[in-house]
Amino acid sequence: MDIRGTTIICVRHQGQVTMAGDGQVTLGNTVMKHGARKIRRMYEGRILAGFAGSTADAFTLFEKFEAKVQEFHGNLPKAAVALAKDWRTDQILRKLEALLIVADTNTTLVLSGAGDVIEPDDGIAAIGSGGSYALAAARALTRHAGLPSEQIATEALRIAGEICIYTNDHISSESLP
């Protein structure tokens, strides 16, 4: 799946979790919007979710995930596995082209349309067109800069935006203590 048009990163560092995303929305090779918000809070603000991919597909998955979070009373891993199972087996959901990063104070997970639920070893996850660049930058900053998670996530996205034409520097972020 070739996801272009956004970058989302989640950094878990020094007891804090920050998810950040750029604001660019691209239709083909045209920038349609600069300040979109692709990070959402759910479950009384205790869970963060960020999405990359087709906007309509991402909103559909976001709504489905939010319903699973409610069903499992905020248990992030159980909600993620339940969504991945539905995503993999439902004929309509299977066609959706989007990725999600979800996080609470204990867990960070990447959810894919292939039914994958991946928990990164180092607490850092990134998706979207500039995801690899942001991930590399965040890992380096985490190891060497001594910055808090919000600054690491923001700077990693800025670096990704300098490299990836589908990522801009209109960054929004949300943090959990």
Curated annotation (Swiss-Prot):
Report what the protein is called: ATP-dependent protease subunit HslV
Q: Which organism is it from?
A: Syntrophotalea carbinolica (strain DSM 2380 / NBRC 103641 / GraBd1) (Pelobacter carbinolicus)
A GO molecular function term, named singly, is: metal ion binding
NCBIfam families, A to Z = ATP_dep_HslV, PRK05456.1
Q: How is its activity regulated?
A: Allosterically activated by HslU binding.
Gene Ontology CC: HslUV protease complex; proteasome core complex
Gene name for this UniProt entry: hslV
UniProt-annotated binding residues for Na(+): G161, C164, T167
- Enumerate the UniProt keywords alphabetically: Allosteric enzyme, Cytoplasm, Hydrolase, Metal-binding, Protease, Sodium, Stress response, Threonine protease
Its subunit composition reads: A double ring-shaped homohexamer of HslV is capped on each side by a ring-shaped HslU homohexamer. The assembly of the HslU/HslV complex is dependent on binding of ATP.
Cited function: Protease subunit of a proteasome-like degradation complex believed to be a general protein degrading machinery.
Tell where it localizes. Answer: Cytoplasm
